[in-house]
């Protein structure tokens, strides 16, 4: 079976980064379109309450994806390091564990979500005006949790063995199916939020079928056969060690969005709808930078496993330069096109007015935001569970959420709007400090190995 050792070990760094990151960035662009589709077509109903309801429910969907990242990012990091250490059998055990782990957890989460639906609706801040729409959307999303988690996990698992293109194809299939079904179910059939949720789940099922077919055709170095399932020998703990911080990062992000929405609800449903649209628009900037940095994680993991610090640092520095250049260009595009971006989703005058201010606020940290994601993915690629966990808790738990309360109390609605960029800059400083420390300890690790 062909592996990607030449790509990981010998290909010039710019080409290796492009080979791994470009398909991942395209996948993230697909995710942007995927996430924008529901809001866009719901917006065509001309009903701000439905837009607000989907915005309120989105963090729950993101939590399901975050739980998929537990196995996806954790598994990808463990697989790339195992391949770097020439332990192919271990990599197969890891992929099989992630397959059945993501499906099993998905079933459990689906059952708990359906049973606790009213509690969830209360926690996300649904008002009397939006709770009905939010309930319709979440009921379908909850049932589809196993498919969301499996497709999220395996989009990352494929990258762990260097199959970024195949990961991209799976994402693309899911998005195309979603975009085709959205206008039919939302507008033609008039199903509103229920139709948006159904289209999303069917798209995830299509992606799952592609990933399963890819493995069953023998195209992969890895395995999803139950005979290769193994939890012992540090496999479950190795996946969880990186997967839990990665998952926790996304869960805290979703929880922070819930807190943000609850703060905005105090100023009416219109700011909630506007922030939902602004954040959807800003996904273009955020997810492309995440795509670049997620794409290089297997390169980091492989070369860390192979003790090749020189190549690891070359990958890190080159990716950092690209992220700043790309972030600056994307920021300028967003500022110039801010009104058009908001009006793409909804043309309500009050929502557009709030939305423009929110888009500009979110761009304040965008040029350097890629550095944060680069540090996070480098730490995860190196398999450093504790530093990854510390950075995760700092970014969302200890910085952003408290800032929402503090700035809301000090500056009102403007404080809530500008909490995100303020938190981003503080998080970037923390991330750089942690990464610098890890690179220094890597020098000591190599000295001990040579001794």
Predicted regions and their residues:
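Short alpha-helical transmembrane segments in multi-pass integral membrane proteins
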Residues: 1-21, 79-146, 188-244, 300-365, ...
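Residue-level signal for short hydrophobic patches within transmembrane helices
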Residues: 10, 14-33, 37, 60-67, ...
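Transmembrane helical elements of multi-pass membrane transporters/channels
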Residues: 19-38, 140, 174, 203-207, ...
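Helix-terminus/linker motif at the lipid-water interface of multi-pass membrane proteins
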Residues: 29, 33-51, 121-128, 184-191, ...
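Residue-level hotspots within pore-lining transmembrane alpha-helices
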Residues: 30, 34, 64-68, 108, ...
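Alpha-helical transmembrane segments of multipass membrane proteins
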Residues: 36-40, 111, 119, 153-157, ...
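Small-residue-rich hydrophobic transmembrane alpha-helices
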Residues: 51-111, 148-167, 274-332, 336-338, ...
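Short runs within selected transmembrane alpha-helices of multi-pass transporters and secretion channels
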Residues: 141-159, 167-175, 196-209, 290-293, ...
């Amino acid at each position: 079976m062909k592996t990607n050792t030449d790509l990981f070990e010998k290909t010039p760094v710019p080409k290796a980064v492009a080979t791994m990151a470009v398909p991942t960035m395209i996948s993230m662009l697909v995710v942007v379109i995927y996430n924008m589709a529901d809001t866009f077509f719901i917006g065509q109903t001309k009903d701000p309450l439905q837009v607000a309801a989907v915005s309120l429910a989105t963090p729950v969907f993101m939590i399901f994806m975050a739980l998929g990242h537990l196995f996806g990012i954790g598994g990808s990091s463990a697989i790339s390091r195992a391949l770097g250490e020439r332990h192919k059998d271990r990599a197969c055990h890891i992929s099989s564990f992630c397959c059945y782990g993501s499906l099993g957890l998905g079933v459990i989460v689906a059952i708990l979500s359906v049973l606790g639906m009213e509690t969830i609706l209360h926690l996300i801040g649904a008002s009397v005006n939006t709770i009905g729409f939010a309930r319709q959307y979440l009921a379908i999303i909850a049932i589809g949790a196993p498919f969301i988690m499996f497709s999220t996990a395996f989009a990352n698992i494929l990258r762990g063995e260097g199959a970024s293109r195949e990961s991209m194809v799976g994402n693309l299939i899911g998005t195309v199916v979603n975009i085709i079904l959205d206008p039919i179910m939302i507008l033609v059939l008039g199903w509103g939020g229920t139709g948006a949720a159904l289209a999303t789940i069917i798209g995830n099922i299509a992606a799952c079928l592609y990933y399963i077919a890819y493995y069953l055709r023998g195209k992969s170095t890895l395995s999803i056969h139950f005979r290769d399932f193994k939890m012992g020998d540090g496999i479950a703990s190795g996946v969880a060690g990186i997967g839990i911080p990665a998952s926790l990062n996304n869960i805290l992000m979703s929880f922070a969005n819930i807190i943000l929405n609850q703060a905005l609800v105090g100023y009416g449903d219109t700011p909630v709808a506007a922030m939902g649209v602004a954040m959807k628009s800003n996904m273009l900037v955020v997810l492309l930078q995440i795509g670049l940095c997620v794409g290089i994680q297997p390169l980091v993991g492989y070369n860390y496993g192979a003790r090749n610090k020189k190549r690891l640092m070359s990958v890190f520095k080159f990716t950092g330069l690209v992220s700043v250049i790309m972030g600056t260009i994307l920021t300028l595009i967003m500022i110039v096109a801010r009104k058009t971006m908001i009006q793409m989703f909804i043309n309500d005058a009050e929502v557009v007015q709030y939305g423009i201010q929110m888009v500009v606020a979110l761009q304040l940290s965008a040029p350097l935001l890629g550095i944060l994601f680069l540090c996070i993915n480098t730490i995860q690629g190196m398999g450093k569970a504790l530093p990854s966990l510390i950075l995760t808790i700092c970014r969302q738990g200890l910085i952003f959420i408290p800032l929402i309360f503090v700035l809301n109390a000090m500056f009102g609605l403007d404080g809530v709007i500008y909490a995100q960029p303020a938190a981003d800059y503080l998080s970037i400083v923390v991330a750089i400090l942690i990464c610098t420390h890890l690179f220094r300890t890597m020098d000591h690790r190599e000295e001990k190995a040579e001794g």
